[in-house]
Amino acid sequence: MTDRANEAVSHLFETFGEKIVETGYHGSIPLITLTPEHLPAVASHICHAPSLRGTLSLQWAVDLRPVIQRFQLFYLFSLAEDGSWLLLTTHLDGSARIYPSITPRVHAAKWYEREIRDLFGLIAQGHPDLRRLVRHEHWPRGTHPLKKEFAWNQVMGRQEGIYHYRRMEGEGVFEVPVGPIHAGIIEPGHFRFSVAGEPVRQLEIRHFWKHRGVEKLFENLTLTNGPALAEKVSGDASYSHSLCY
């Protein structure tokens, strides 16, 4: 742990005191455990306190069942100045599936919390936009592919549905759709521009057209067989994905 990270943990203890359940490490990264209701305040403080000025770099969930009846949430922050890492975590026990959203205070969490809802069925209460992100509208209701009970070879049905794009209206405003099919090896992506002449007034992006259960396939592979699958995740990132794996 760097001196900067050590100072950050001490600062959070001084500020939030008993709201912090415990501290530890995830590898060499400081790990602070909180109850769900205190997440928004602590996450916001990390991002906006002048002495910290952290950036939310990643947010993810883990389904620990059947070993423990628990879902665990992680929030990885990079601190200003030296880029030290700081990790927050909380958990939902038993049948709990709702946790407080940090998006209203930390806007970078917006897509992460939507993705977690789609893949795990965990709902970020207070999120301003819980439209589907990874699960496109044809996915059956209640289908969450990273829950432990979802089998890697499960055949899903298909339902009809419409994705409601955000609309911008006004004199001289036009929508310009681009994609999802593009030339070359670039992955599919739909970009919907709202323009008024040359200025772009709004852009809405839809990705995840090729979600195909890769995470579940990894669960069934040995460590040595994983790189071959990692290379196939994305056509324009085969080397970087296998290297990270």
Q: Which sequence ranges carry the predicted segments?
A:
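Terminal low-complexity/charged segments
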Residues: 1-203
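Active-site- and interface-proximal helix/loop "cap" or "latch" segments in soluble metabolic
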Residues: 174, 178-245
